């Protein structure tokens, strides 16, 4: 059994195969996942797991250099936005519209679906390097 925090084998596999600038998304339970993207469905019931639990656990395993958020996130879900900023630290944030974010999902290695029900609880993580 793995000793690290992340136990989900599908998510662990995708992260281990990611290279510099590859992208993975984490979304709420309503985010439409394109057919072209690998779906990693973690949602069990409403609210479980949360978006932030999933983001924090993913960041234990994945080095990131940038995140992409919908412009609407800050205005519609300000508490979530502040929590994201706190968790990612000095990582660059790029803002695009929610519609552009949904289109960008097609370029992600995978889209992780959580049980989150907070509006705009969606993020795209761009992989960095550890050296």
From Swiss-Prot:
<feature type="binding site">
    <location>
        <position position="98"/>
    </location>
    <ligand>
        <name>substrate</name>
    </ligand>
</feature>
<keyword id="KW-0413">Isomerase</keyword>
<feature type="binding site">
    <location>
        <position position="28"/>
    </location>
    <ligand>
        <name>substrate</name>
    </ligand>
</feature>
<dbReference type="GO" id="GO:0062193">
    <property type="term" value="F:D-ribose pyranase activity"/>
</dbReference>
<dbReference type="GO" id="GO:0005829">
    <property type="term" value="C:cytosol"/>
</dbReference>
<feature type="active site" description="Proton donor">
    <location>
        <position position="20"/>
    </location>
</feature>
<comment type="subunit">
    <text>Homodecamer.</text>
</comment>
<comment type="similarity">
    <text>Belongs to the RbsD / FucU family. RbsD subfamily.</text>
</comment>
<comment type="pathway">
    <text>Carbohydrate metabolism; D-ribose degradation; D-ribose 5-phosphate from beta-D-ribopyranose: step 1/2.</text>
</comment>
<comment type="function">
    <text>Catalyzes the interconversion of beta-pyran and beta-furan forms of D-ribose.</text>
</comment>
<feature type="binding site">
    <location>
        <begin position="120"/>
        <end position="122"/>
    </location>
    <ligand>
        <name>substrate</name>
    </ligand>
</feature>
<dbReference type="InterPro" id="IPR007721">
    <property type="entry name" value="RbsD_FucU"/>
</dbReference>
<dbReference type="GO" id="GO:0019303">
    <property type="term" value="P:D-ribose catabolic process"/>
</dbReference>
<dbReference type="GO" id="GO:0048029">
    <property type="term" value="F:monosaccharide binding"/>
</dbReference>
<protein>
    <recommendedName>
        <fullName>D-ribose pyranase</fullName>
        <ecNumber>5.4.99.62</ecNumber>
    </recommendedName>
</protein>
<keyword id="KW-0119">Carbohydrate metabolism</keyword>
<dbReference type="Pfam" id="PF05025">
    <property type="entry name" value="RbsD_FucU"/>
</dbReference>
<dbReference type="InterPro" id="IPR023064">
    <property type="entry name" value="D-ribose_pyranase"/>
</dbReference>
<keyword id="KW-0963">Cytoplasm</keyword>
<dbReference type="GO" id="GO:0016872">
    <property type="term" value="F:intramolecular lyase activity"/>
</dbReference>
<dbReference type="InterPro" id="IPR023750">
    <property type="entry name" value="RbsD-like_sf"/>
</dbReference>
